[in-house]
Amino acid sequence: MKKILNLFVISAFLSISSAAFAQNVKPAATKPSVATLPNGASSLTETYGLWSVNCGIQDGNKICIMLRQEVNEQDRVLLSMSVSLDGEGTVSGNLTIPFGILVSKPIRLHVDDSKSVIESNVRTCVPAGCVVPIVFDKNFVGSLRAGKQLKLSMTVAAPGEPTLDNLFVQLDGFSNALKRLTSLQK
């Protein structure tokens, strides 16, 4: 009788524990979809006028930027500009400008001879130059799309604090590059 009782307790325990295990079984997690580029490529570089669009897959995420570098006669990079889009479609970027700029004064940006100006400050300096973060509003993006040059004006860190206003980023191809960047981000 005691054996039957023990057998009954053990079977009850096993049936309860197997039911408990059955309830705790989680369905196999579905893998998140991995970002892809056209034709299954792992990286992509395309040229639109003077701008390039570069994309790559990093940790399963698609990362794309637009890039333009302005060089001098010796092919040394004077300044560069990268542009990206966030999840809401906000256009932002970074300028890398030469050393010797008074970092306590803003960098002023305007397209061609427009009176619309964006000001931003140097964020940090790295071996390539000083980095200036920029966020463009929709009106300024429209000006960039239609313009010929993004002109920069800054103060030189020199006696008398002269203005340096002959640096610019050429915008030939900007509009098509931004259109492609937008389509790649989807």
UniProtKB/Swiss-Prot annotation:
UniProt entry tagged with the keyword Signal: yes
Pfam families from the UniProt entry: IalB
Swiss-Prot/TrEMBL keywords: Signal, Virulence
Cleaved signal peptide residues: 1-22
Family recorded in the similarity comment: Belongs to the IalB family.
Function as written in the Swiss-Prot or TrEMBL entry: Required with NudH/IalA for erythrocytes invasion.
Protein name (record): Invasion protein B
Origin species: Bartonella bacilliformis (strain ATCC 35685 / KC583 / Herrer 020/F12,63)
